[in-house]
């Protein structure tokens, strides 16, 4: 059985191929475009909860109203790598918004995003980001109001910036 999110990811890839074809680009141009692309997969992150401190890695706790969360996973449940984390931090700095880094506690499984599913089908430099929140997937999810403004400002700056692939990663340029 094919997961619905996987079908959506495959559709995203096909749509991108159709757009390239409509613009008169061939398969080589499609792959060149992918190599220079950068994807931000936005979902929320688990904010530190003082009543359950043992469930959090002590060096990567994230807090509500603490800024955009960059999510990483040694098990590759998130798409973030060193390059995409560095680019995201540069965009946050340019946007004037704080950022924080989240990693799951080593012995507690968790995490996975649609970005990781899409990235399993097509290799694009990508980052998993979000806002810190408590009670994820419950009827009483709680997040910080400042984080909404931070994420909006990050997204605005992200879309107003041209990322240029370089030998060592990416550079940021104004559009």
Regions found by a protein language model. Give the residues of each.
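Active-site-adjacent substrate-binding region
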Residues: 45-52, 56-140, 166
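Structural signal for hydrophobic packing residues in well-ordered secondary-structure cores
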Residues: 16-24, 49, 92, 96, ...
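Flexible, glycine/charged-enriched surface loops at secondary-structure junctions
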Residues: 25-36, 95-106, 163-173
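His/Asp/Glu-rich mid-to-C-terminal helical/loop segments that flank catalytic regions of hydrolases
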Residues: 131-175
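Single conserved hydrophobic/aromatic residue that forms the stacking wall/gate
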Residues: 1-8, 12
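A glycine- and small/hydrophobic-rich beta-loop-beta segment
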Residues: 10-67, 71
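Predominant activation on well-ordered alpha-helical scaffold segments within soluble catalytic domains
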Residues: 13-17, 85, 89, 115, ...
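Conserved structured core elements
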Residues: 10-13, 82, 108, 145, ...
